Amino acid sequence: VLQAVIYEGLRMRPPLLGLLPKIVPAGGDTLAGHFVPEGTAICANASSLLRSEDLFGPDADIYRPARFLELPNAEAVVSMQRNVELAFGSGQWQCVGRHLAFMEFHKVVFEVSGGLQRNSCRCFLFANL
């Protein structure tokens, strides 16, 4: 449950709120069936990806940690967690502090939740802000 709370919090409020630019290497590359010439800057918007209904379901704008607990198998959980971890970038450009950040997330959520009563709460829809 702790993992689900952390990943859902990270999904709803990613640490990086910008584009993740990359430059297409020499010779160009094919992306989603389209040729992209070398030197072209391409970007991924992590914030949009983390609110994608295709990846996180029709309630992607709702904070609902249970989405990580309702998956059918471990592979689906790992896949969803990897999608959330895109908030830290990917490949050789991934944030070197990712592991430290997750360690701190676990510590903070554990310590803060220790003094709270365990009652169910209403979901909060960020789209209504």
Residue ranges: model-predicted function:
Residues 98-129:
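Cytochrome P450 heme-binding "Cys pocket" and the immediately downstream C-terminal segment
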Residues 32, 69-105:
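Cytochrome P450 heme-thiolate "Cys pocket" and heme-binding signature region
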Residues 1-32:
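Conserved cytochrome P450 K-helix E-x-x-R motif and the immediately C-terminal K′/meander segment
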Residues 44-76:
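Conserved cytochrome P450 K-helix/beta-meander segment immediately N-terminal to the heme-binding cysteine loop
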Residues 43-44, 87:
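Structural recognition of the beta-strand scaffold that forms the well-ordered cores
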